[in-house]
């Protein structure tokens, strides 16, 4: 297994069920993210992608969006020592240009600071949407002089125009929170991904739950459209 992607769903509902503000769920969700990433690093999963903030999340209340942007900036700064300790290389997925300047600067700092790390690569999908990524990749292709004839375009050439072309295809996509949909996440990269859905809300998702999911993945047979 090369690449595990996670849709970390259920932070707000976790808080609301406890009579707390949604912000409390988002804070607790960050702690869960650290625990899960540390565990995946320990078992040497080479690539992990976390769905942090989608292009659709801008539709939430201005108050919640403002809180999330501040939380993301704070989290990236706080986790720098964690990334160094585990030799994690951080890459960003999503449109950085439309993020608040302070958030964008913090992302750029963490990406540059961890560029030489040789441990697990953690891709943070912030202001990310699968359709948006594909559209931006198409625009790159159209502006490229290396492929003037669309008929010559290959999957490999197109993949090189995605946000993080070094990421391999997703092997296993985990979604917490009870919903069973992709929510515009890694549409190109998940063509042959195995999916795992759980009702557990993200803040309650423990390392044991993740290991149980990985055990189920190992029992599956992937044929990639062929025969067993």
Swiss-Prot record:
The lineage of its organism: Bacteria, Pseudomonadati, Spirochaetota, Spirochaetia, Spirochaetales. One of its GO terms (biological process) is polyprenol biosynthetic process. Belongs to the UPP synthase family. Its cofactor is Mg(2+). This is Isoprenyl transferase. Homodimer. HAMAP family: ISPT. NCBIfam families: PRK14833.1 (NF011407), uppS (TIGR00055). Keywords: Magnesium, Metal-binding, Transferase. Coiled coil: none annotated. InterPro entries: UPP_synth-like, UPP_synth-like_CS, UPP_synth-like_sf. PANTHER family: DEHYDRODOLICHYL DIPHOSPHATE SYNTHASE 2, DEHYDRODOLICHYL DIPHOSPHATE SYNTHASE FAMILY MEMBER. SUPFAM superfamilies: Undecaprenyl diphosphate synthase. Binds 2 magnesium ions per subunit. It is an enzyme of class 2 (transferase). Catalyzes the condensation of isopentenyl diphosphate (IPP) with allylic pyrophosphates generating different type of terpenoids. GO terms for molecular function: ditrans,polycis-polyprenyl diphosphate synthase [(2E,6E)-farnesyl diphosphate specific] activity; magnesium ion binding. It comes from the Bacteria. CDD domains: Cis_IPPS.
């Amino acid at each position: 297994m090369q690449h595990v992607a996670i849709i970390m769903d259920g932070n707000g509902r976790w808080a609301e069920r406890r009579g707390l503000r949604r912000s409390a769920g988002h804070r607790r969700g960050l702690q869960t993210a650290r625990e899960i990433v540390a565990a995946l690093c320990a078992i040497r999963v080479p690539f992990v992608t976390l769905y942090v903030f989608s292009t659709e999340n801008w539709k939430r209340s201005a108050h919640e969006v403002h809180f999330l942007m501040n939380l993301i900036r704070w989290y990236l700064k706080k986790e720098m020592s964690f990334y160094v300790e585990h030799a994690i290389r951080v890459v960003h997925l999503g449109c950085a240009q439309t993020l608040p300047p302070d958030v964008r600067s913090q992302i750029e700092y963490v990406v540059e600071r961890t560029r030489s790390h040789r441990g697990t690569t953690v891709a943070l999908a912030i202001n990310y949407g699968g359709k948006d990524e594909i559209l931006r990749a198409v625009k790159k292709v159209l502006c490229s002089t290396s492929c003037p004839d669309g008929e010559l375009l290959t999957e490999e050439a197109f993949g090189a125009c995605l946000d993080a072309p070094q990421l391999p295809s997703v092997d296993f996509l985990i979604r917490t929170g009870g919903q069973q949909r992709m929510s515009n996440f890694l549409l190109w990269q998940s063509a042959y991904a195995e999916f795992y859905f759980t009702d557990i809300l993200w803040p309650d998702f423990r390392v044991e739950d993740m290991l149980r999911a990985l055990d189920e993945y190992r029992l599956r047979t992937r044929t990639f459209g062929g025969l067993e």
